[in-house]
Amino acid sequence: MFVVIFGRPGCPYCVRAKNLAEKLKGEVANFDYRYVDIIAEGISKADLSKSVGKEVETVPQIFIDEKPIGGCTDFEALMKEQFHVVA
């Protein structure tokens, strides 16, 4: 499983998602992630909206194996369900 987290500095939900991904990387086989700082990379919410397929108002926006799954709480719920790991 490969997770991409699109976030920005100063976003507490981005930090939570990144911390959970880091924990999973250490505990779950075949799990890896990449954190993308949308400010540093020059990615706009309009750019993210194109990838997600609907208008994006918040970050983080998280993709699992290239499929958009939503934000931090969606990610936490999926990881708890699939791996029984909580943040």
Role assignments for model-derived ranges:
Residues R16-A17, S44, D74:
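Residues at alpha-helix caps and immediate loop-helix transition turns in enzyme cores, especially N-
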Residues I64-A87:
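Non-catalytic, surface beta->alpha helical segment in thiol-disulfide oxidoreductase systems
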Residues V52-F63, C72-T73:
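Structural micro-motif
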Residues M1-R34:
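Local sequence-structure signature of Cys/Sec-based thiol-disulfide redox active-site neighborhoods
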Residues V36-V56, F83:
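Thioredoxin-like thiol-disulfide oxidoreductase module
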Residues P12-Y13, I43, G70:
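Short alpha-helical
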Residues N19-A21, K50, E76-M79:
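Short, glycine/charged-enriched secondary-structure capping and boundary segments
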